[in-house]
Amino acid sequence: MTDFHTLIDSYQNCACGQAHECAIRDIEIGSGLVSEAGEILKKNGFGPRLLLAADEQTLAAADGIEASLSGFTVLRHIWPSIRVATMQDVEKIEGYFDRVDGVLAVGTGSVHDPCRLACARHNVPLCLFATAPSMDGFASYSAPIVNGNFKITYPAKCPEVIIGDTKILADAPAELKSAGFGDMISKYIALIDWQVSNLLTGESYCERVAALTRRA
């Protein structure tokens, strides 16, 4: 298996002429990592004051994650249930930023996206802990947010750290796994969209990045 940082470094000085960069420091995938989340955060330089963001279902799925955060002063923002991320959710997360050094978002897209945009707007370190393989955007630089009854995709930030506990991911409901499969299949359409945009608007295009996506 190719080391993540080796893979990123191999895209330096690309023939397409674009600078390919990735702000992710660490990706940890393995069984039982829910009990190691705190140590992973410390290893990657997260400060002692932490916001834990989740909803009741995702926090239950990640049972044991709070116990792993020994040594952190933890504030909690727990939605009863969050299906669609709104700008109000972004602003709720931002309301903690005078009291925390980083954010641990536990869940998938609807939990991650408001944290992703809030952290981007305030340059706050972010760790995403995945509780289901329901989408393919864990490393995304954008966040779809409902604002004024319109869903808008905002430029955001990728997380500094991504953690996936394979036991938790395997135990996710079948419909969430199916949603993730659908997201992966849609990448083929997205690559065609990218080529069309390159032809019609001159958007930059890199065949090496496209090929990496196809292989994934």
Can you annotate each of these PLM segments?
Residues 67-72, 210-216:
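Short, charged low-complexity intrinsically disordered segments located at boundaries
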Residues 62-64, 114-116, 138-139, 173-174:
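Short glycine-/acidic-enriched loop or helix-start segments at secondary-structure transitions
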Residues 34, 111-113, 134, 141:
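Short, electropositive, low-hydrophobicity segments enriched in small/polar residues
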Residues 1-102, 160, 172, 178-182, ...:
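ATP/NTP phosphate-donor binding region
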Residues 97-132:
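A short, small-residue-rich loop immediately preceding and capping a beta-strand
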Residues 53-54, 107, 164:
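Short beta-strand/turn micro-motifs composed of small residues
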Residues 122-215:
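A glycine/threonine-rich phosphate-anchoring loop and its flanking beta-alpha core
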Residues 14-16, 22, 115, 119, ...:
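Generic recognition of cysteine residues
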